[in-house]
Curated annotation (Swiss-Prot):
This is Kelch-like protein 3. Disruption phenotype: Mice display pseudohypoaldosteronism type II (PHA2)-like phenotype, such as salt-sensitive hypertension. In kidney, increased level of Wnk1 and Wnk4 kinases is observed, while Wnk1 and Wnk4 levels are unchanged in other tissues. It comes from Mus musculus (Mouse). Belongs to the KLHL3 family. The modification Phosphoserine is found at residues 376, 433. The gene is Klhl3.
């Protein structure tokens, strides 16, 4: 009414607003957009309402401007700007092949695309051009999943050209972490001088010894010797010679013709020799890039358990993840295999010889952890089961074993560089069910069964590759056939095994410096025919049998506490005569 003041409406409180919202119901149909794009794609396939034709090479693709603009900033700028293409009915896209353009426009409508080894190198730059960043990322993820010692340098170069920063860093880290395998490949040998220098100068290079870096330099020079000879000094500047063992400097580096014929390289060698003559406290005072130890990023490791008897020969392969404390099944062997020799060499796991359930075999299968697949390589000269296998100086040795009728004293070696097997000196004693290990450049054959005396053996032999001779060293304290043999901190361990019907849980350790064996703590369980490996300062003994049943349990020994501890998780199946190797966990 006239003359009366009007009161302002009260402001709604936050609580009242929430209550009002709760009274309103907003329905979101998650499938709506998908249905809409499905219909738009159907219209496109029927050429209905299309208002633009995109052309690449001889491929013409009809489409809807609004759809292309909504999904691709490249097309959005083209259709909404002042360029002539904004009105054109037909638009040619250069630098993209027709098939790839068609795939990417399909993706815009369907959100589906298949990235393969065959198309990724054309798909990624085309997706970058059209600013389809999800597809570009899919391509990068695919390439990252395909990283392998044979292709990581090529992927790194590809990532660099196309400014894929994360992929570039991942490929570079992969090359550093897998350098001993990368240096064997064609991609490494084809690198430029600057690229090799950049790689071998990295503190993050993962090498067990600086020997690998020296060998890589020599290989790279020799690959194109005439044109690369002048680069020797530049490369040797990045090899940390003072960190090499003195014996290697004298026997290998000093004798290398490429070093002898280059005064600068000889100076680097003299620097290294002088470094070794200094007392330790004075060495620590020398600060230059060649005396600085590398500090690689340690890759997590996994343990691979290959084949075995359960109770018959099996194809199954299990993998134990030390970080996560769990077992997983991985790619099976191509055929049943137990009583094989299993080793890790040059980035791969080798399963050598063994028994397939009916025959002793000569065949060898190789596992690639990155691809999770097995392939076959050259077979041994002789059939061998219950053999010992070990790696020494980049050669795989197959020691002794049983050929189906007799125990073997023969030994053969395999070079992965030539894919060939050749015999070396035989042992002094026939040994089946023999355990082997490498300590300080010597190969040891421990115990076993000789078949002639019908007794298990306590004797041990040592092979020197420099003289191609076997000699006896100190006997074990007890006879052991089927002992699990492993190396930890420069000492040789013999675990369990049996003497006739008696299966042992005792363990003894050999010190090559004193040529003596001593007893350490017993295992928790009696085991023979178990697999053994050393990881992170611990010795793992895997499976085996106790004389009556196969074991799924695993236990590890800590030399600091002299104690054995059972892993809390067992393998999925009890395995005797399985082989064990440790590899880097795939990224």
């Amino acid at each position: 009414m006239e003359g009366e003041s009007v009161k302002p409406s009260p402001q709604p409180t936050a609580q009242a607003e929430d209550e009002e919202k709760n009274r309103r119901t907003v329905t979101v149909n998650a499938a709506h957009m998908g249905k809409a794009f499905k219909v738009m794609n159907e219209l496109r396939s029927k050429r209905l309402l299309c208002d633009v034709m995109i052309v690449a090479e001889d491929v013409e693709v009809e489409a809807h401007r609004v759809v292309l603009a909504a999904c691709s900033p490249y097309f959005c700028a083209m259709f909404t700007g002042d360029m002539s293409e904004s009105k054109a009915k037909k638009i040619e896209i250069k630098d993209v092949d027709g098939q790839t353009l068609s795939k990417l426009i399909d993706y815009i409508y369907t959100a589906e695309i298949e990235v393969t080894e065959e198309n990724v190198q054309v798909l990624l730059p085309a997706a970058s051009l059209l600013q389809l960043m999800d597809v570009r990322q899919n391509c990068c993820d695919f390439l990252q999943s395909q990283l392998h010692p044979t292709n990581c340098l090529g992927i790194r170069a590809f990532a660099d050209v196309h400014t894929c920063t994360d992929l570039l860093q991942q490929a570079n880290a992969y090359a550093e972490q897998h350098f001993p395998e990368v240096m064997l490949g064609e991609e490494f040998l084809s690198l430029s001088l600057d690229q090799v220098c950049s790689l071998i100068s990295s503190d993050k290079l993962t090498v067990s010894s600086e020997e690998k870096v020296f060998e890589a330099v020599i290989s790279w020079i020799n690959y194109e010797k005439e044109t690369r000879l002048d680069h020797m000094a530049k490369l040797m500047e990045h090899v940390r010679l003072p960190l090499l063992p003195r014996d290697y400097l004298v026997q290998t580096v000093e004798e290398e013709a490429l070093i002898k014929n280059n005064n600068t390289c000889k100076d680097f060698l003299i620097e290294a020799m002088k470094y070794h003559l200094l007392p330790l406290d004075q060495r620590l005072l020398i600060k230059n890039p060649r005396t600085k130890p590398r500090t690689p990023v340690s890759l997590p490791k996994v343990m691979i358990v290959v084949g075995g008897q359960a109770p018959k020969a099996i194809r199954s392969v299990e993998c134990y993840d030390f970080e996560e404390g769990r077992w997983d099944q991985i790619a099976e062997l191509p055929s049943r295999r137990c009583r094989a020799g299993v080793v890790f060499m040059a980035g791969h796991v080798y399963a050598v010889g063994g028994f397939n359930g009916s025959l002793r075999v000569r065949t060898v299968d190789v596992y690639d952890g990155v691809k999770d697949q097995w392939t076959s390589i050259a077979s041994m000269q002789e059939r061998r089961s219950t053999l010992g296998a070990a790696v020494l100086n980049d050669l795989l040795y197959a020691v002794g074993g049983f050929d189906g009728s007799t125990g073997l004293a023969s030994v053969e070696a395999y070079s992965y560089k030539t894919n060939e097997w050749f015999f070396v000196a035989p042992m002094n004693t026939r040994r089946s069910s023999v355990g082997v290990g490498v300590v300080e450049g010597k190969l040891y054959a421990v115990g076993g069964y000789d078949g002639a005396s019908r007794q298990c053996l306590s004797t041990v032999e040592q092979y020197n590759p420099a003289t191609n001779e076997w000699i006896y060293v100190a006997d074990m304290s007890t006879r052991r056939s089927g002992a699990g043999v492993g190396v930890l901190s420069g000492q040789l361990y013999a675990t369990g095994g049996h003497d006739g019907p008696l299966v042992r849980k005792s363990v003894e350790v050999y010190d090559p410096g004193t040529n003596t064996w001593k007893q350490v703590a017993d295992m928790n369980m009696c085991r023979r025919n178990a697999g053994v490996c050393a990881v992170n300062g611990l010795l793992y003994v895997v499976g085996g049998d106790d004389g009556s049943c196969n074991l799924a349990s695993v236990e590890y020994y800590n030399p600091v506490t002299d104690k054995w501890t059972l892993l809390p998780t067992n393998m999925s199946t009890g395995r005797s005569y399985a082989g064990v190797a440790v590899i880097h966990k795939s990224l």
